[in-house]
Amino acid sequence: MLLITEILIINFFAATDLVQLYIVYEASLIPMVIMIGVWGSRTEKKIAAFQILIYTLIGSIFMLMSIGLLYSTLGTTDYILIREYIEVLPENVRKIIFIGFFIGFAVKIPIAPLHLWLLRAHVEAPTAGSVLLAGILLKLGGYGYIRYNIGLFPDLCEYYFPIIGGICLISILYTGIATLTQLDVKRIVAYSSISHMNVIVLGLFSGVLQGLEGGIILMIGHGIVSGGLFLCIGVIYDRCKTRILYAYNNLVHMMPIMAILFFLLVLGNIAFPITSNFVGELLIFIGLIKKNIIIAFFSALSMIITAIYSFWLYNRIFFVNEIITREANEGIQMEVNKMTIKEGGINKKVTEGEIIGELEYPQYIKKESMKYSDVNIFEFVSIGLMVILMLIVGMKPSLVEGYIAINCLELISK
């Protein structure tokens, strides 16, 4: 499945014909749907796979409409020819095509309210699926914006930026605040991923060189950091057999190496200096300040919210003491006991380890109940490579910036 996905993604990035683009864009769904539907880790994996299919197919209808409109007016689906003659189209036609591409790729980013499929997909997906989804598949939307919205319609990006900026700000603030209410650690990272991807969209559509460069660098950094966080959560779940936040207790004593790796990735998630996300977000905010100071101010709030829930997540997993954890568990039990299951007309009280929908009452994690005490060599290398890449890009951003600067200048000059 991973090999098939890789082939489809390479074809998407290399596509020079819009029909080829549409085919591989749709086909890239199939491996992920199978991966979640067959190897998913929870009871609602088939629903998650179905949601991915429906959301993406509905979004791609708008993209197909834009491709059809381009073909009917220009007589070709070749990207090079379309880019050369796109200016001859009437303004209203160009706006319709722009909106169609924007909605089609907005599902893949995703931008609220088109984000619901991603939350369920991450919760139900196996660890490899979550890493692939956060690290690569979401970037198809960002690349689509760069090549087909910004590359073909730079003037309309300027025209629609206030609307796009407002939508992204709502999405950023909503997902950031919603993260603080979650109990499932995978949902927390999934919400964080949505927030970061919307910051990327702001940078890409800012029309400023620094914003565009920052958006591309943050896409790289987000893929590294979010992928690493999902790997860490997968390792912790393998030991503790639960992802409910309040189930964990002082894991720093049981998994000290994991605590260090997780902390470094949390620093990357909050865009701490010398990490890849810092470079990307700094450039984006410089671009937004040049573009619109109000949007820049409210988008900067995302950094504060991200720091709050990231350190809160880390503290709850690795440093919460036994008294706090037991009190929290008692609070959860009181809330869960209000929910009942009717079996044969009889209300059934919820007990430890039982699942109500997506909420599983967690048993208190103790060292003797864990299969291993810390990461093994394979897990250490996998997560460690993510950390090293994050630090390399953060300390030496010119390694990637040099490759994207020329193309960004070309886009901005239009």
UniProtKB/Swiss-Prot annotation:
EC assignment: 7.1.1.2
Keywords: Electron transport, Membrane, Mitochondrion, NAD, Respiratory chain, Translocase, Transmembrane, Transmembrane helix, Transport, Ubiquinone
Localisation: Mitochondrion membrane
Pfam families found in the cross-reference section: Proton_antipo_M
Gene Ontology biological process terms in this record: ATP synthesis coupled electron transport; electron transport coupled proton transport
Membrane topology of this protein: Multi-pass membrane protein
UniProt GO molecular function: NADH dehydrogenase (ubiquinone) activity; ubiquinone binding
One of the record's GO cellular component terms: mitochondrial membrane
Reaction(s) catalysed (UniProt annotation): a ubiquinone + NADH + 5 H(+)(in) = a ubiquinol + NAD(+) + 4 H(+)(out)
Transmembrane parts of this sequence: 18-38, 47-67, 96-116, 126-146, 160-180, 188-208, 216-236, 254-274, 293-313, 375-395
Residues in the signal sequence: none
Family membership: Belongs to the complex I subunit 4 family.
Protein's job: Core subunit of the mitochondrial membrane respiratory chain NADH dehydrogenase (Complex I) that is believed to belong to the minimal assembly required for catalysis. Complex I functions in the transfer of electrons from NADH to the respiratory chain. The immediate electron acceptor for the enzyme is believed to be ubiquinone.
NCBIfam families, alphabetized: NDH_I_M (TIGR01972)
Record-given protein name: NADH-ubiquinone oxidoreductase chain 4
Native species: Dictyostelium citrinum
